[in-house]
């Protein structure tokens, strides 16, 4: 990923299949990734858990290893156990005691509503809460409201969800994007051009790669990056642990065929 020219790397997130890893595997990967990157780019480590104590212990491990940032979803477990706004605030405040910058992940997977006033309150009152990855429905509207109401305390408004809403989110005030590992080398120029005021160039570049982003987001999910990395010799296997099913053959072939038109780094890196 460093040779994809990324500005940072996020580990143990939902697209990292964190929900299929044991506690021991999580700790091993946290150590391995932070040590292997060795300061070349910042590493963001996801520490989400319904238990505040467990999330805090994960944060302390990251701190001890020299990790640069944490990412957290609000506390949830299954479809019905969800932290209240106050409980969510308290969990982020407690994890903030570890002394590592926090990115709040507002993702639909949690099913927890994070209204903008709560996010602004967290940014104002919890020292370590500085960044926000917004990938809920109508993300652009929420980003715009967050930036307008939070102003300078919202240090890092990020787009997510593989960049499927990237251009609208940039127009709304996002200053960064967290994509999958499949094509960050193709997404980065869009963001940089936009932030440099080259809006038409950014829009053109985004429109060119949007079919591949759409195919990943709507047809494949997190399996896309693994398939492309295996095809490109980056990894040996694209196996997904049960109960995740393998991608249907025709969809897999369609992904590889489409990706070959764009030639992302991941498709050739290990060949």
Indicate where each model-derived feature is located.
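C-terminal alpha-helical cap/extension of soluble enzyme domains
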Residues: 4-6, 171-174, 182, 186-271
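Secondary-structure boundary motif
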Residues: 3, 35-39, 64, 97, ...
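Conserved, mostly hydrophobic/aromatic
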Residues: 1, 33, 62, 95, ...
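Active-site beta->alpha loop and helix N-cap motifs at the rims of alpha/beta catalytic domains
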Residues: 2-111, 268-270
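Catalytic alpha/beta core domains of metabolic enzymes, predominantly
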Residues: 108-219
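Flexible glycine/acidic-rich beta-alpha junction loops that bind and position SAM and/or redox cofactors
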Residues: 80-81, 142, 227
